[in-house]
């Protein structure tokens, strides 16, 4: 198959996305697929090639390390030689239209909030992951929490603040609380807040990345994550940071966090409850093909932190580790994702197909 692995783009999670994209591309080529890496925002200079010839080259780097630098839109705009700020870079759409399917390795921003998915649906381009409606709801932590609560899924209390309200706010919860961008990921802009002064500075930082902030009650407990691929929940992975909390550095730089799968001393009933809730959360949010659900577990049960509709696929990402613990290697995982979504297309069961029936 001809497969475009679409990554990069204009997002604070750009560097994570590129690392995911390189690894996915290399794995697909090892599986005999004509996979090529394309940066959504920077595009591809054909340099005399035909679109078909693009698939002859992986177009990847051997460097999978992730910089801890958080790029702003202004930083990323400077990377594009033509000075354009259009979402799709040169030749991206033409190359994607020539593919049998596009593997979305985008994280955050327009790649995860449904905009790219909507453009592809309009243009008849097949892609992995969920459709635009489910992606938009899931990317917005306020919307997704409201959907989860409506369906009886336990999640921490929360309150939303908008940028135009300013940072001088009070919250209806006791400290500590967690402050994060409403539509962010990879813990960019996320803070654990212990007092009113920290709340104001935390909101100021969040508003650098998003027009909306979500403040959540702090939920103590053990932290877990479960991947769901084609309706099947993998075994949980427990996340144990060696110091501090599970921020960007702890997620993507080696040596800061221990990932334990299967988790030790976890009651099987609790483990099964997390699996059931993970599948239920995917279902109520309308997520398809694959995703990841993050949890806290304590004496009061399991609490969904958030859902991830395009989870990371880097060397330290959780979903590949969970799959490997269940006997599914990285190459088989990416092929399961591709084949699972192609089956949904064939059965007319994608979001676009269901909405037009």
Swiss-Prot record:
<comment type="pathway">
    <text>Cell wall biogenesis; peptidoglycan biosynthesis.</text>
</comment>
<feature type="binding site">
    <location>
        <position position="306"/>
    </location>
    <ligand>
        <name>Mg(2+) 1</name>
    </ligand>
</feature>
<feature type="binding site">
    <location>
        <position position="294"/>
    </location>
    <ligand>
        <name>Mg(2+) 1</name>
    </ligand>
</feature>
<keyword id="KW-0961">Cell wall biogenesis/degradation</keyword>
<feature type="binding site">
    <location>
        <begin position="172"/>
        <end position="225"/>
    </location>
    <ligand>
        <name>ATP</name>
    </ligand>
</feature>
<keyword id="KW-0464">Manganese</keyword>
<dbReference type="InterPro" id="IPR011761">
    <property type="entry name" value="ATP-grasp"/>
</dbReference>
<dbReference type="InterPro" id="IPR000291">
    <property type="entry name" value="D-Ala_lig_Van_CS"/>
</dbReference>
<dbReference type="InterPro" id="IPR011095">
    <property type="entry name" value="Dala_Dala_lig_C"/>
</dbReference>
<dbReference type="GO" id="GO:0008360">
    <property type="term" value="P:regulation of cell shape"/>
</dbReference>
<dbReference type="GO" id="GO:0005737">
    <property type="term" value="C:cytoplasm"/>
</dbReference>
<dbReference type="InterPro" id="IPR011127">
    <property type="entry name" value="Dala_Dala_lig_N"/>
</dbReference>
<dbReference type="GO" id="GO:0071555">
    <property type="term" value="P:cell wall organization"/>
</dbReference>
<dbReference type="InterPro" id="IPR016185">
    <property type="entry name" value="PreATP-grasp_dom_sf"/>
</dbReference>
<protein>
    <recommendedName>
        <fullName>D-alanine--D-alanine ligase</fullName>
        <ecNumber>6.3.2.4</ecNumber>
    </recommendedName>
</protein>
<keyword id="KW-0133">Cell shape</keyword>
<feature type="binding site">
    <location>
        <position position="308"/>
    </location>
    <ligand>
        <name>Mg(2+) 2</name>
    </ligand>
</feature>
<dbReference type="GO" id="GO:0009252">
    <property type="term" value="P:peptidoglycan biosynthetic process"/>
</dbReference>
<keyword id="KW-0963">Cytoplasm</keyword>
<dbReference type="Pfam" id="PF07478">
    <property type="entry name" value="Dala_Dala_lig_C"/>
</dbReference>
<keyword id="KW-0067">ATP-binding</keyword>
<dbReference type="GO" id="GO:0008716">
    <property type="term" value="F:D-alanine-D-alanine ligase activity"/>
</dbReference>
<dbReference type="GO" id="GO:0005524">
    <property type="term" value="F:ATP binding"/>
</dbReference>
<keyword id="KW-0460">Magnesium</keyword>
<dbReference type="InterPro" id="IPR013815">
    <property type="entry name" value="ATP_grasp_subdomain_1"/>
</dbReference>
<feature type="binding site">
    <location>
        <position position="306"/>
    </location>
    <ligand>
        <name>Mg(2+) 2</name>
    </ligand>
</feature>
<keyword id="KW-0547">Nucleotide-binding</keyword>
<dbReference type="Pfam" id="PF01820">
    <property type="entry name" value="Dala_Dala_lig_N"/>
</dbReference>
<dbReference type="GO" id="GO:0046872">
    <property type="term" value="F:metal ion binding"/>
</dbReference>
<feature type="domain" description="ATP-grasp">
    <location>
        <begin position="145"/>
        <end position="339"/>
    </location>
</feature>
<keyword id="KW-0479">Metal-binding</keyword>
<keyword id="KW-0436">Ligase</keyword>
<keyword id="KW-0573">Peptidoglycan synthesis</keyword>
<dbReference type="InterPro" id="IPR005905">
    <property type="entry name" value="D_ala_D_ala"/>
</dbReference>
<comment type="similarity">
    <text>Belongs to the D-alanine--D-alanine ligase family.</text>
</comment>
<comment type="function">
    <text>Cell wall formation.</text>
</comment>
């Amino acid at each position: 198959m001809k497969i475009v692995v679409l990554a990069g783009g204009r997002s604070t999670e750009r560097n994570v996305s590129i690392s995911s994209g390189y690894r996915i591309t290399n794995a697909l080529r090892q599986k005999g697929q004509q996979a090529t890496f394309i940066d959504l925002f920077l595009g591809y200079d054909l340099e005399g090639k035909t679109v078909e010839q693009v698939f002859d080259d992986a177009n990847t780097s051997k460097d999978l390390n992730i910089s801890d630098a958080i790029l702003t839109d202004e930083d990323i705009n400077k990377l594009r030689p033509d000075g354009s700020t259009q979402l799709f870079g040169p030749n991206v759409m033409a190359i994607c239209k020539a593919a049998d399917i596009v593997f979305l390795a985008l994280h955050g921003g327009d790649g995860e909030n449904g905009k790219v998915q909507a453009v592809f649906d309009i243009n008849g381009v097949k892609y992995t992951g969920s459709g635009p409606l489910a992606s938009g709801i899931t990317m917005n932590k306020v919307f997704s929490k409201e959907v989860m609560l409506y369906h009886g899924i336990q999640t921490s209390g929360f309150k939303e603040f908008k940028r135009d309200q300013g940072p001088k706010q009070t919250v209806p919860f006791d400290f500590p609380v967690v402050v994060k961008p409403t539509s962010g990921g990879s813990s960019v802009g996320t803070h654990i807040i212990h007092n009113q002064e920290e709340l104001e500075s935390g909101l100021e930082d969040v508003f650098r990345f998003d027009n909306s902030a979500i403040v959540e009650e702090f939920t103590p407990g053990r932290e877990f994550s479960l991947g769901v691929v084609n309706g099947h929940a993998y075994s949980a992975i427990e996340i144990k940071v060696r110091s501090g909390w599970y921020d960007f550095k702890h997620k993507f730089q080696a040596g800061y966090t221990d990932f334990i799968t299967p988790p030790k001393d976890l009651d099987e009933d609790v483990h099964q409850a997390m699996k059931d809730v993970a599948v239920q959360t995917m279902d109520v949010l309308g997520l398809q093909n694959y995703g990841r659900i993050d949890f806290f577990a304590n004496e009061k049960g399991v609490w969904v932190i958030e859902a991830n509709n395009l989870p990371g696929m880097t060397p330290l990402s959780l979903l590949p580790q969970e799959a490997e613990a269940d006997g599914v290697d990285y190459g088989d995982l990416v092929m399961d994702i591709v084949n699972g979504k192609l089956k949904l297309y064939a059965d007319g069961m994608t979001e676009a197909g269901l909405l037009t029936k």
